[in-house]
C-alpha cells in the first residue's frame, strides 16, 4: 500500500517539474543593448517571429531614444537607468532602429538593425 502513494507523489512531482519547464520556455529572451556616443551595441540583433523578447536598453552617457516604427517601439533611454521593452515580433523582416532624441553631433548616424526571422 505504501508503494501507491509514493508513485502518486513521484508522478505529481514530475508533472510539476514539466509544467515549470513549460512556463520557463515562455519567458521572454533578454537582449542587452547599450547606447553610447552615437552608436548602439550590438549593431544588429536577430529575433524569432512569434517569440517574446525583452530589449534591455541602457545608456552609458546621455539620454538617447530608441525608435523602431515597424515594431511599434518608442522608448527613452536615460543614463544610469535600465529601460526594458518587451515585444513579440509578428512579421519577419529587417527594421532600422534610430535614436530619436538629439544626443549630439553624430546623432544622425546612430542606428542599428533588428532582424526578425
Describe each region flagged by the PLM.
Residues 25-52:
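N-terminal edge beta-strand
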Residues 19, 78-117:
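Extracellular/periplasmic metallocenter environments
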Residues 7-16:
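Bacterial N-terminal signal peptides
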Residues 1-6:
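Positively charged n-region of N-terminal signal peptides that target proteins for export
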Residues 20-24:
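Boundary at the C-terminal end of the N-terminal hydrophobic targeting segment
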Residues 37, 51, 58-61, 70-72, ...:
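A mature extracytoplasmic/lumenal domain signature
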Amino acid at each position: 500500500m505504501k508503494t501507491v502513494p509514493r508513485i502518486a507523489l513521484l508522478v505529481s512531482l514530475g508533472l510539476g517539474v514539466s509544467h515549470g519547464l513549460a512556463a520557463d520556455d515562455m519567458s521572454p529572451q533578454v537582449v542587452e543593448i547599450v547606447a553610447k556616443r552615437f552608436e548602439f551595441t550590438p549593431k544588429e540583433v536577430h529575433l524569432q517571429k512569434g517569440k517574446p523578447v525583452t530589449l534591455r536598453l541602457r545608456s552609458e552617457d546621455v539620454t538617447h531614444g530608441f525608435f523602431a516604427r515597424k515594431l511599434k517601439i518608442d522608448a527613452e533611454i536615460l543614463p544610469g537607468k535600465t529601460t526594458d521593452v518587451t515585444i513579440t515580433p509578428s512579421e519577419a523582416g529587417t527594421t532600422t532602429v534610430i535614436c530619436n532624441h538629439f544626443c549630439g553631433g553624430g546623432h544622425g548616424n546612430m542606428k542599428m538593425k533588428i532582424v526578425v526571422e
